[in-house]
Amino acid sequence: MGASSPRSPEPVGPPAPGLPFCCGGSLLAVVVLLALPVAWGQCNAPEWLPFARPTNLTDEFEFPIGTYLNYECRPGYSGRPFSIICLKNSVWTGAKDRCRRKSCRNPPDPVNGMVHVIKGIQFGSQIKYSCTKGYRLIGSSSATCIISGDTVIWDNETPICDRIPCGLPPTITNGDFISTNRENFHYGSVVTYRCNPGSGGRKVFELVGEPSIYCTSNDDQVGIWSGPAPQCIIPNKCTPPNVENGILVSDNRSLFSLNEVVEFRCQPGFVMKGPRRVKCQALNKWEPELPSCSRVCQPPPDVLHAERTQRDKDNFSPGQEVFYSCEPGYDLRGAASMRCTPQGDWSPAAPTCEVKSCDDFMGQLLNGRVLFPVNLQLGAKVDFVCDEGFQLKGSSASYCVLAGMESLWNSSVPVCEQIFCPSPPVIPNGRHTGKPLEVFPFGKTVNYTCDPHPDRGTSFDLIGESTIRCTSDPQGNGVWSSPAPRCGILGHCQAPDHFLFAKLKTQTNASDFPIGTSLKYECRPEYYGRPFSITCLDNLVWSSPKDVCKRKSCKTPPDPVNGMVHVITDIQVGSRINYSCTTGHRLIGHSSAECILSGNAAHWSTKPPICQRIPCGLPPTIANGDFISTNRENFHYGSVVTYRCNPGSGGRKVFELVGEPSIYCTSNDDQVGIWSGPAPQCIIPNKCTPPNVENGILVSDNRSLFSLNEVVEFRCQPGFVMKGPRRVKCQALNKWEPELPSCSRVCQPPPDVLHAERTQRDKDNFSPGQEVFYSCEPGYDLRGAASMRCTPQGDWSPAAPTCEVKSCDDFMGQLLNGRVLFPVNLQLGAKVDFVCDEGFQLKGSSASYCVLAGMESLWNSSVPVCEQIFCPSPPVIPNGRHTGKPLEVFPFGKAVNYTCDPHPDRGTSFDLIGESTIRCTSDPQGNGVWSSPAPRCGILGHCQAPDHFLFAKLKTQTNASDFPIGTSLKYECRPEYYGRPFSITCLDNLVWSSPKDVCKRKSCKTPPDPVNGMVHVITDIQVGSRINYSCTTGHRLIGHSSAECILSGNTAHWSTKPPICQRIPCGLPPTIANGDFISTNRENFHYGSVVTYRCNLGSRGRKVFELVGEPSIYCTSNDDQVGIWSGPAPQCIIPNKCTPPNVENGILVSDNRSLFSLNEVVEFRCQPGFVMKGPRRVKCQALNKWEPELPSCSRVCQPPPEILHGEHTPSHQDNFSPGQEVFYSCEPGYDLRGAASLHCTPQGDWSPEAPRCAVKSCDDFLGQLPHGRVLFPLNLQLGAKVSFVCDEGFRLKGSSVSHCVLVGMRSLWNNSVPVCEHIFCPNPPAILNGRHTGTPSGDIPYGKEISYTCDPHPDRGMTFNLIGESTIRCTSDPHGNGVWSSPAPRCELSVRAGHCKTPEQFPFASPTIPINDFEFPVGTSLNYECRPGYFGKMFSISCLENLVWSSVEDNCRRKSCGPPPEPFNGMVHINTDTQFGSTVNYSCNEGFRLIGSPSTTCLVSGNNVTWDKKAPICEIISCEPPPTISNGDFYSNNRTSFHNGTVVTYQCHTGPDGEQLFELVGERSIYCTSKDDQVGVWSSPPPRCISTNKCTAPEVENAIRVPGNRSFFSLTEIIRFRCQPGFVMVGSHTVQCQTNGRWGPKLPHCSRVCQPPPEILHGEHTLSHQDNFSPGQEVFYSCEPSYDLRGAASLHCTPQGDWSPEAPRCTVKSCDDFLGQLPHGRVLLPLNLQLGAKVSFVCDEGFRLKGRSASHCVLAGMKALWNSSVPVCEQIFCPNPPAILNGRHTGTPFGDIPYGKEISYACDTHPDRGMTFNLIGESSIRCTSDPQGNGVWSSPAPRCELSVPAACPHPPKIQNGHYIGGHVSLYLPGMTISYICDPGYLLVGKGFIFCTDQGIWSQLDHYCKEVNCSFPLFMNGISKELEMKKVYHYGDYVTLKCEDGYTLEGSPWSQCQADDRWDPPLAKCTSRTHDALIVGTLSGTIFFILLIIFLSWIILKHRKGNNAHENPKEVAIHLHSQGGSSVHPRTLQTNEENSRVLP
């Protein structure tokens, strides 16, 4: 996409120095935009727009804030091009309605049809055509608006509606049809038939049928006639009748007359049904109804094991019947008869004879299901399956077997016991939601979370399933659904679980493995399969090795003959099978076998057994009778023998058969056969045989027979006692009444048992049957039977029990990362210790004791957790650093090294004071601490103030903060400690000496254990510690349960006295009517005392009452304080009687009697103010039970309390029944504190207390901000704000605040802790002709100063001045980016004139007068005023001497709009500030939607600033009314409005008496929420109320359900799924209806199979060898080196059979955008940035490249990087241009000439000399460069050559003078002639002339002036005699003489010279008084002058000699004056050889 950056709406800063304003702003905008993603964030790639496309495509995924993307409308849409902008909130501006779909023309209705516009006629829309009734559509029935070129058209032409045609109507005999058109017939055309008339128009034929038919259509395409045509027949005639399969016997004529009879017969193989003859009636009808001919039936089918009637017939007529009957032993299934049908078939289907079946199995399985077999025949099996969560206890099946002569079920219904799981595993560094003593039933879920560790700086991640569920293994034991997760640090997998089926190929001791590690496994010997490997995945879980190794199996075991095999689980190795025989057979051999491994094969451990029929011995013989049997020798199980008595003579009956006449062979142990009962007797009627009593003696005569009513008496043998009546009477049928007595031995007292009590201690003798009961003392378990019975043999049975000390079960817990230390035994008081490995700390109890809990011995604490010890982040030290990383975890043993920062720039060196290495260790409490304090970086010589000691204090307080080496500080122990005073000293290593173990904490005395109790020392017994007391089970604590070690004076003692442990007493046990209790002590009853009840006996010891209830109760306690009895006492009642039922607060409506008879019904009602729960009527059952369960009368509850900011459901009710619940919920933003539900108690109160709604609070903000501060609010409620502020020199990366916000139903901090990054500045800018003190190594830290200087160029003769600040400092801009404090200065060539350039434009101010100049002299002032949006006074800037404008900081400030209004229920987000140009954003609280603009900007309005938009409104999000459900309703406190957070609770309708009719399936409560913060939706679908034990029809996509046409299914019903073609099933094919309307197992799903994933160029994917992939399978792509993966790294096979997402591609690695800039040059970027790409650097003309000319994209490790940075473009300078003889150039003498500068040459002019020079060569040369970039001149310098003109004439003469030199013949240009004057004349002016190039002499401007010497008018002391003239001429002499008293000083004579002076100078006359002094002074002066003259003369001579040598070609022409006077010679010079440059 074309990404462009807009101009910032507000200027960010001045443009870069040296750039014009237009360019500087753009450059700065680019820089700002490049910085924005870091500072403010970025936008992701915008969504694909269906109506528009980007003008330029790009592969970018992220775009900086402020980026523009340009779009144009797609074909089919109209609109202008537009742009979207990435806003500061990282959201793209909207593009809605920018492009509108083009419209096709309005489609016309087809004739006789219409067009249906579905959704408009715009691009992409579709229209439909239809025809009016009777017309058919010719053409396309629809059209779509599509693109065609630049417009849109309909893709199909308008169709035609053609009238539906019909063919010709059918013709009829003797008639015709009438129609308006006889050729064309269309839809709706009607034709009417009529019969042809006879001659004369008479009616001959009758029209029979519909007279009119019409043209219609069934498919709107083809026309058909509405019915058959009528017929025209002669009246009273009939057409021939037609009988299918029949033959007309009569003549077959075309017509039959009225009343004519015809006859039929059927074709062969058919029989007739109906009349053979029919008669012709009026209107062509035959009567009676025509017959039918039906086929004859063949003989019916034979049925196995059945007979049928009429076996002798071969043919059967329709309607004939046959009857079936089965053989004996079989039941007839189906109809007993079949009938022959007219079609020749038998109906109904033939029956079958099936083996007899058992009756329906009537047993019910509570909490389970009974699975019935297909049939109930012999051998049929009924299976018992428990519901999910229950395990089977008992037989899993019942078989239909033959028992005697009957078929019965061989076992009863088992029991389904609820499954419970052990306590969920404890995990290190984590916790679960289970409670310590909680019970975990099947289905219970437990959630795991990891502990936060802000003190360690460590965050743990939960690896594995966060939720585990209590489920079961195949054996029905409770197990957790998956292993407990673990809390670990991401990046490694723990060691994998041990596999039962496989083992590692190579063993390893590693405990963790990096992601991607693979471990190779091979199957164990009991399994088979290929080797495989598992891999540590990215989610830190090992890949699954399911179904890799399969368990070897044995062969399917055969059923033994007359037996069966029971496969318990399967037939794999290790499994066991059981054998059993059918009833009546015994098992010979092994009853079980195990599948074992032998070598590599699996086989059964034993051979199958044999089932042998159980034999019986001969049946008993009887006197006077015999038995009858089919076989009198062999008798087996089931054989029946029948007895009969011998008849008398003549066959008369003599004996009576007394007893069962038949007995059968059976078995009690399935091994030995016995007869079912004693044989009967054959006795004489009304006689009895002698009665037999074992160990008894018949006192009466012992005869062989006794008469009716005769009485006999018994007594027992010595040593035996009688039980029962002594006398019995002979009754009819040889019976004695009452029942015969028994004689049993007498028992001695039973044995005493140690630590036990027994009942009936006061008795010496015990009758047989008498029982004694044993009970153990508390803390002991009874081993053996609890009671002993006196046997008839005089012994006690069974053996006496023993009382053993109670023991706890084996301690099964494992301690990960620790050890469990076991005791010698596990008896009460035993202790298991837990010790953690080094580096781990114990979380939980350090020991578990075996204690007595109630009557059980249990371990009092579960396994603790050994959590790894972590240390907090090591302390940060000023001026130093450590080797720890910012987010590193510091486990036990980790070492950290400290070093001090080097500060060479500061001139400071710090030394590390203290230990340089500290190690993570632990304190006595197991907390992670560092081995020593962190060192410090300081300047040597002083210790810092010592740490505060908990155990000691300074003797003398001091405020000093540092102390010199050697300082000692004195300490004394604090009151809680004891020890001598001590001192610490500041050592040479600047650390204080250690005061270890100087003061020790005072301790209390060791507390004694109370009797029957124990003391628990929590930590120690030192001052401040606490101990707890507890009593052993059965004792209560009297006194204080804890004590603290406190200080009193100087002594430590316990705060309270030890308590007393008193045995818990119980009151007297309850008394019962008609019974009493037995106990060793009937007065005192304590915890553990057991009493046993028994009922009183009637007269003679007979049993009168039945004991109903628990016979024994024991003393226990619920609160360890008050003793109570374990349950109610039993009752002694008369059998089949009930005591009056008692209902609290209930009234018995029936008569209140003491006893009620069996099945008697009583009725209750409740007292006023109470409501009944349960049945009103109950019935007396056996054992004193009333059924159904008694009702209860409970108080009515008033409405529950209302709570602020909360509501409860139901809320509309006035009265609440006991047990009813109400549910509380809070408004959004509030948390419920307390119980969520209250229930109405039977006392009429609500329990527990009502909750309250508190404003939601976020958890403590635990994040730390290194190099910054976290500013906390006053509270942590919703809306609270935590601010983050970085220290100076650091910038915030991330959000500057974190708000406590509502997310869903939780309150969370919306941002995590940001990072404070060190601010760095880029390398300081390089300047031309200058340098800085910065290093080239990289970024410069905040605060660093850089100095600039200009380069010296003495070789160039140039000097540069530094313009700007010479020092810049690394500081930061408002966004935290590192910037330099001011622009870099520049080095400008020093020039005399000083000007400032045009000042930069200020964003905040404008000049009062427009600026048009480009340069301003030093001192110029410009006046400015603030722009709109800013305020401040007018100010001015001045051009300073350093050619920089004066500073303008803080002159104008942005105006403020003030705080923006905060919307109610929302908040304002101030991004930067509220000043002009700033933007603030609005957001609404959770549950509210924003109406209005989400942002507003502070803009100019008039002379002020204001927010451009009003604050939006936060409107609460509402939901539609919650969905209604069948058979149920919802409760809510408001049924009209449903706002966000509103909770509604559903419940199902109940029956009239409150009984449950429906089951609520699904979430009981749903709440109003929102997915887009705009529209309210309900959190989930509502639950359903379905019939109890019913399931709704499950739906599986792409599957077919069998059966599929029902909406409800019954409990345990099974349905099957199969997938549609092309789909595969994942999951179970069958599911079963479970309770709660659920299907189990989980519903399957049908997914398409995926083909292999696509191959990609330069890449590969995993699982490349696989052909088919199941849904959910993943493949992972990777690229070859040098290629990057673009797209998703993994694809997964979707249920639709596709791969998702799209396959990635491998693109050549690319370098990042090359962001470097090249001042004075260009960066040439390549077409792409892939590896090998080259960025070239080209300097602008006049600059040369210093550095590399290109940077290549190269591979460095795994990253693509540019291999060189940006070079520098230096300005090119040329050396000074060459000088030329007789010429000059325009260059300056100041130094180098810049590139491009042109220099012009010209030849010197010499008009005075008369010479002219010509320029030979280029007159201009330009500074350019050679290929190496050096400055060179464009061409060589030119030269000046003399032009040769005409010679000059003879030189002119002058007055009083002449030229010297001889006369020459030719005077050439350039020749010089010198002139001299005659003696007495002096030359004035130039003394020469020269010949010019024009051939004339230069101007003669000299002359000869006469020489005159002046004489002073007055001379002191001169002789007056002398006559002096005023003027003397050249050559004149004067002589001087002085007057007396004067002395002549000087020469007495002097001559007038040619230069108008006297030589020697005129003398003076001086007074003689000063002669000596004057003479001395003059002499010295003269000598000094002469010396100087002499030296000067020597030097001059030397120079002249040199000049003579330098000019050997000079010609001197001496022209002497005529007078012979000495004159200075003049020289005539020539330039004939151009050897000298003229002056």
Curated annotation (Swiss-Prot):
Subcellular location(s) of the protein: Membrane
Glycosylation sites: 56, 252, 410, 447, 509, 578, 702, 860, 897, 959, 1028, 1152, 1310, 1481, 1504, 1534, 1540, 1605, 1763, 1908
UniProt region (Disordered), positions on chain: 2017-2039
InterPro entries assigned: SEZ6_CSMD_C4BPB_Regulators (IPR051277), Sushi/SCR/CCP_sf (IPR035976), Sushi_SCR_CCP_dom (IPR000436)
Cysteines joined through disulfide linkages: C43-C86, C73-C99, C104-C145, C131-C161, C166-C215, C195-C232, C238-C280, C266-C293, C297-C340, C326-C353, C358-C400, C386-C416, C421-C470, C450-C487, C493-C536, C523-C549, C554-C595, C581-C611, C616-C665, C645-C682, C688-C730, C716-C743, C747-C790, C776-C803, C808-C850, C836-C866, C871-C920, C900-C937, C943-C986, C973-C999, C1004-C1045, C1031-C1061, C1066-C1115, C1095-C1132, C1138-C1180, C1166-C1193, C1197-C1240, C1226-C1253, C1258-C1300, C1286-C1316, C1321-C1370, C1350-C1387, C1396-C1439, C1426-C1452, C1457-C1498, C1484-C1514, C1519-C1568, C1548-C1585, C1591-C1633, C1619-C1646, C1650-C1693, C1679-C1706, C1711-C1753, C1739-C1769, C1774-C1823, C1803-C1840, C1848-C1891, C1877-C1904, C1909-C1952, C1938-C1965
Effect of R1601G: In Sl(2)/Vil antigen and Sl(3) antigen
Sample GO molecular function, one term: complement component C3b receptor activity
Family in the record: Belongs to the receptors of complement activation (RCA) family.
Cytoplasmic compartment residues: 1997-2039
Name of the coding gene: CR1
Tissue expression notes: Present on erythrocytes, a subset of T cells, mature B cells, follicular dendritic cells, monocytes and granulocytes.
UniProt name for this protein: Complement receptor type 1
Quaternary structure and interacting proteins, as annotated: Interacts (via Sushi 1 and Sushi 2 domains) with complement factor C4b. Interacts (via Sushi 8 and Sushi 9 domains) with complement factor C3b. Interacts (via Sushi 24 and Sushi 25 domains) with MBL2. Interacts with FCN2. Interacts (via Sushi 24 and Sushi 25 domains) with C1QA. Interacts with CR2. (Microbial infection) Interacts with Epstein-Barr virus gp350.
Keyword vocabulary terms for this entry: Blood group antigen, Complement pathway, Disulfide bond, Glycoprotein, Host cell receptor for virus entry, Host-virus interaction, Immunity, Innate immunity, Membrane, Pyrrolidone carboxylic acid, Receptor, Repeat, Signal, Sushi, Transmembrane, Transmembrane helix
SMART domains: CCP
Membrane topology note: Single-pass type I membrane protein
SUPFAM superfamilies attached to this UniProt entry: Complement control module/SCR domain
GO cellular component, one term: plasma membrane
Segments crossing the lipid bilayer: 1972-1996
